[in-house]
Swiss-Prot record:
The lineage of its organism: Eukaryota, Viridiplantae, Streptophyta, Embryophyta, Tracheophyta. This is Acetyl-coenzyme A carboxylase carboxyl transferase subunit beta, chloroplastic. NCBIfam families: accD (TIGR00515). GO terms for molecular function: acetyl-CoA carboxylase activity; ATP binding; carboxyl- or carbamoyltransferase activity; zinc ion binding. It comes from Olimarabidopsis pumila (Dwarf rocket). Keywords: ATP-binding, Chloroplast, Fatty acid biosynthesis, Fatty acid metabolism, Lipid biosynthesis, Lipid metabolism, Metal-binding, Nucleotide-binding, Plastid, Transferase, Zinc, Zinc-finger. Belongs to the AccD/PCCB family. The keyword Phosphoprotein does not apply. It is found in: Plastid, Chloroplast stroma. One of its GO terms (cellular component) is chloroplast stroma. The keyword Chaperone does not apply. Its EC number is 2.1.3.15. A zinc finger (C4-type) spans 227-246. GO terms for biological process: fatty acid biosynthetic process; malonyl-CoA biosynthetic process.
Length: 484
């Protein structure tokens, strides 16, 4: 549950109420005079507002008042008080059902009601002296189910014109640029369809934004990514798919990893046209194997679960293979095994250092024993590469790396590097528990646990990985090409 603290100053005293809001919310109903002690605000019948601790007073045309107990009904959960850089105050209100968004700089009525509510609520929970000024009134919020146009417009307007005079904090006390999304938008992140929305402000009565069928997931999903751990939003091109809020490492596509590791303009892919032909005619009632491959190809733009090729890493020529978990769970079939085998053979002939980035659920069951053969085939050519030619192979394990990949080339590197918090195992937790009838200790299959047991050489964050690889290559006498 998130909380909000509004920097609104109030004082204590006595308050007379001569009316309250009716349940209909669109009209006022008379009520008996109610006196609340310990509040220093008074309204008289002429609608003049006085502060007992102040010398000045002013009048404002106001209808009947509301009692403190009704303030939560009067001020909607969708109303926010903000202050701009010139210390001017505004109220911001939006109505989901009516598709209405309003910014008003004349909200003295609401401000009075809100002050009164804060004061009376605070008095019920405080025993401090009458002369104290109190800040940061605590208000419990509710879940906000916002449509996308409100989400986008509030964010753009706030960042352009208004400095929010409040702090939006999660339970972990992390504050970041996505606080607007986290506080206003629902945690589920579900997007509702919208038709035609107009947003206006009472300051200039002009339309700020008028859009049709605005959907952030359709127009901006190539720019933003959502953390699957804390649901925070971040700009994926800059942050390397590492959540700013919780530090969670999100999965990366193979193309993103290539872009992260290889110098621009130096990538030369290999065997791009190699595709699986369903060698054992695998039968499935749910979805034929051929259809699953076609679907994965359309989703990822890849022909299979690995990309191989050559390029330069800080000027050092390297052979690189990157597995893609989004293609059928990164499973290793005959095509994956053949492409990696050919890459290793090419690196052997050209005497290139080798990097294999692993992200796989293991052998592909739709290809039966042919997928298991790839483990031996890749291990065989790696033996020639490492033992006979004395070349340098670095294995990078990302989350998840399991099954046949872990049991073969994943753990055969001269240097084995893992990403932070990576899930690395041969058999998954569920399989072990069902087989042995014992619980698997929490974190026992995480990279940090494997490092302590000596199964890994290092855990390297993504932002440091390219530099670490460059230093390791130079340590093993692989240097950048001379630039003439």
């Amino acid at each position: 549950m998130e909380k909000s603290w509004f920097n609104l100053m109030f004082s204590k005293g006595e308050l007379e109420y001569r009316g309250e809001l009716s349940k209909a919310m669109d009209s006022f109903a008379p009520s008996e005079k109610t006196t609340i002690s310990k509040n220093r605000f008074i309204y008289d019948m002429d609608k003049n507002f006085y502060g007992w601790g102040e010398r000045s007073s002013y009048s404002k045309n106001v209808d009947l008042l509301v009692s403190s107990k009704d303030i939560r009904n009067f001020i909607s959960d969708d109303t926010f008080f903000v202050r701009d850089s010139n210390k001017n105050s505004y109220s911001i209100y939006f109505d989901i059902k009516k598709k209405f968004f309003e910014i008003d700089n004349d909200f003295s009525d609401l401000e009075f009601f809100f002050y009164s509510y804060c004061s009376s609520s605070y008095l019920n929970n405080s025993s401090k002296g009458d002369n104290d000024l109190h800040y940061d009134s605590y208000i419990k919020d509710t879940k906000y189910n916002c449509t996308n146009y409100i989400k986008s417009c509030i964010d753009s307007y706030f960042r352009s014109y208004i400095c929010i005079d409040s702090n939006f904090l999660s339970d972990s006390n992390n504050s970041n640029e996505s606080y607007i999304y986290n506080f206003i938008c629902s945690e589920s992140g579900k997007i509702r369809e919208s038709k035609n929305y107009k947003i206006r402000t009472n300051r200039n009565r002009s339309n700020l934004i008028s859009s049709k069928d605005f959907d952030i997931t359709q127009n901006y999903n190539q720019l933003w990514i959502q953390c699957d751990n804390c649901y925070g939003l971040m700009y994926k091109k800059v942050k390397m798919n590492v959540c700013e809020q919780c530090g969670h490492y999100l999965k990366m596509m193979s193309s993103e990893r290539i872009e992260l590791s290889i110098d621009p303009g130096t990538w030369n892919p290999m065997d791009e046209d190699m595709v699986s032909a369903d060698p054992i005619k695998f039968h499935s009632k749910e979805e034929p194997y051929k259809n699953r491959i076609d679907s994965a190809q359309k989703t990822t733009g890849l022909t299979d679960a690995v990309q191989t090729g050559t390029g330069q890493l800080n000027g050092i020529p390297v052979a690189l293979g990157v597995m893609d978990f989004q293609f059928m769970g990164g499973s290793m079939g005959s095509v994956v095994g053949e492409k990696i085998t050919r890459l290793i053979e090419y690196a052997t002939n050209q005497r290139l250092p080798l990097i294999l980035v692993c992200s796989s659920g293991g052998a592909r069951m739709q290809e039966g024993s042919l997928s298991l053969m790839q483990m031996a085939k890749i291990s065989s050519v790696l033996c020639d590469y490492q033992s006979s030619k004395k070349l340098f192979y670095i294995s990078i394990l990302t989350s998840p790396t399991t099954g046949g990949v872990t049991a073969s080339f994943g753990m055969l590197g001269d240097i084995i590097i893992a990403e932070p918090y990576a899930y690395i195992a041969f058999a998954g937790k569920r399989v072990i528990e069902q087989t042995l009838k014992k619980a698997v200790p929490e974190g026992s299959q995480a990279a940090e646990s494997l490092l302590r047991k000596g199964l890994l050489d290092a855990i390297v964050p993504r932002n440091l990985l390219k530099g670490v690889l460059s230093e390791l290559f130079q340590l093993h006498a692989f240097f950048p090409l001379n630039k003439n």
